[in-house]
């Protein structure tokens, strides 16, 4: 299955890439996702597979220091997880303190070099989810679509190919 290279990932929290900023420093803004019902491990593994990333740091709730007590039924949940990409990372955790409300107005944007790779990622993320804008050509791109995946994360998937 063609996957293409991820050019950049955007979210309300920032851009998933390294940028040089004034003064010569570099920065990296990374979306951080919260999952209810202990679904972080499953979701992040799915995203790593679909978006051709690699699972990085994983911290289980059971490994938290004693000053951070965790309910017994949540010890298998994740306190932190990372999916690494060449230019950044996607991070997440389970909502250990209680249910997390979805962010209003926030989406994770992934832009691929090719329409084929973008459409493939869109269709795989859509499994068990709901399309809010079907993947199709637009006036700015050969392919773009929006969806909420089965974990409740809202995605915008596009490509660099001209319409």
Annotated model-derived regions:
Residues 5-11, 15-25, 29, 35, ...:
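Vicinal oxygen chelate
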Residues 36-41:
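Short acidic-aromatic low-complexity motifs
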Residues 43-51:
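Amphipathic alpha-helical segments
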Residues 57-76:
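N-terminal G-site of the GST-like fold
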Residues 104:
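Acidic/polar active-site rim loop that often engages polyanionic ligands
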